[in-house]
Amino acid sequence: MATETTNNNVSPKNPAPTVPSSIPTPSISDEKITEMVERVKTDRNVRLSLADGIKDIVNRNLIIVGTGDGGCNIAQEINKACPDTYFVAYNTSARGMDKLNADVIIIPQEEDGSGKVRSYSKEVFCSANGYAQELLQAISSLADKINNLEYILVTTTADGGTGGGVSPMIAPFLNENMDLPVIILGVYPSLTEDATAMFNALQWQSEVEKTGCPYIILDNNDPDVSSKLQVHQKVNAQAAQMIKILTGEMFGPTNISAIDNRDMYMLLKHIGGRICIYGQEGKPPVGKSIDEYIMDMIQYTNSPAPNEVDGIGLFIKGPETFVKNADTSLTKICATYGNAAIRYFHLEVSDDPYIAIIMTGNSEPTDRLMIMKQRYDEIMNNIKKTASSVTDIMSDMNNPLSKPEKKTAPKNMDLSALDFFKE
């Protein structure tokens, strides 16, 4: 992994002073000329080596922190797609953790899952057992091994207890202590999940907004795929593809126009907000514009559509004729999703065409959140109706055993289990 290098020898030379004809010009020996020629050769080699380093400014590395079962599976998929990344897994359950290819695994030994209870996982993470400190130490240790480390990515499912509970805590915690931008990647639940999943996801979204950290949303709600496992695999693969675009894994050096690390920082951190990332191999067929090609990508990606976009990074890679003639005005994109205040472009000549776009500063996906709220209300109303029906049916019923004789309670009975019902 190469380290980004900057060529400081770029200032223009001052024009040579005019030498009056009356002053004799000193002669230069053959040895001096030979020395100067060799120095020029050396300087040229140095400049070429510095030029080789240009390719590194479009690539950036990150550490992934997978939280909970779903978050760790997402992180594993990203780690496979981006081999230069490091992967830390945090979970309150040991189930399946031995199958992960994580660099560091943190499991509270006295716990066995969170049972979808977000507050429980928060308490475990902040407990006196030091799991927050252990995570920070692991991240710090890995950071020392990585060149060109630019971001930390925290992955989770939004509806779970462990990842959904701790990810909005971990992100600002690492952001403050590591002095690195932290991005959260979360996945919304399918609408076929229970009311707790809807409630947890809505709580997670509200907390993520409060962190101020940039975030990416994917969605497990896919009516076209009936198998839950297939949906998860599809979404995890899309997450990996998004991060490959973000890290620059999909692109190389170019002398036309590049989105370097500073440009990406402006998009992801300075503008921030909700980040939407789309990419696809190939190029538009004859008769289809780049805008239409990208809008098709947006439609078929398991992610809420962009809205009120503030920043855009457009990546176009392909044959020279296609790249040079590409329409980068994005007129339809801006008219549909928001007229971004700032845009960056990466144009690269390559035999392997690929088009991608990063759209930042999006507001929260209100329409999708309202659908989850409606689903939650629907489930809870059905529960209330069922309870009311049972009450009505039993209103004139008596226990056929009449009133059984009570058993005498032991003198030293342990009543602590009843505390559970006091909440």
Feature locations, PLM:
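Tubulin/FtsZ superfamily GTPase core signature
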Residues: 2-423
